[in-house]
Amino acid sequence: MIKLNFSRELRLLTPAQFKYVFEQPLRASTPEITILARRNDLQYPRLGLTVAKKHLKRAHERNRVKRLCRESFRLLQHELPNYDFVIVAKHGIGKLDNPTFTAILSKLWQRHIRLAKKSLSN
């Protein structure tokens, strides 16, 4: 049975881990959100989130966005390549309702899966 947990080892925790992804990322983006990715040497993908107060003033809005991102990652983690992912929230993300937001995330994850397969074949 496949475990669909989101344990500590699946998270980017230190500034150095985030910096590694920001240096030379693969990008998939929409006007409201960007997912950056970079290959890691581990046997599993990891996730980091950046949701600035500049874009979402209220804590409960930032928490909603982070919760939806974590849930999306948790459900797709076994389909994703072994990359470190950083989700960057942009202006206008707070206006999206939950079903729209999860649909956008799903499209971006699929784009990263395709990009990873393409980079492996090269």
UniProtKB/Swiss-Prot annotation:
Membrane spanning residue stretches: none
Main function: RNaseP catalyzes the removal of the 5'-leader sequence from pre-tRNA to produce the mature 5'-terminus. It can also cleave other RNA substrates such as 4.5S RNA. The protein component plays an auxiliary but essential role in vivo by binding to the 5'-leader sequence and broadening the substrate specificity of the ribozyme.
InterPro entries per record: Ribosomal_Su5_D2-typ_SF, Ribsml_uS5_D2-typ_fold_subgr, RNase_P
Stated name of the protein: Ribonuclease P protein component
Subunit structure: Consists of a catalytic RNA component (M1 or rnpB) and a protein subunit.
Organism expressing this protein natively: Mannheimia succiniciproducens (strain KCTC 0769BP / MBEL55E)
One Pfam family of this chain: Ribonuclease_P
Reactions mediated catalytically: Endonucleolytic cleavage of RNA, removing 5'-extranucleotides from tRNA precursor
Keywords, comma-separated and alphabetical: Endonuclease, Hydrolase, Nuclease, RNA-binding, tRNA processing
A molecular-function term among this protein's GO annotations: ribonuclease P activity
Superkingdom field: Bacteria
One GO BP: tRNA 5'-leader removal
Family: Belongs to the RnpA family.
Any one Gene Ontology cellular component term annotated for this protein: ribonuclease P complex
EC number: 3.1.26.5
Gene name as annotated: rnpA
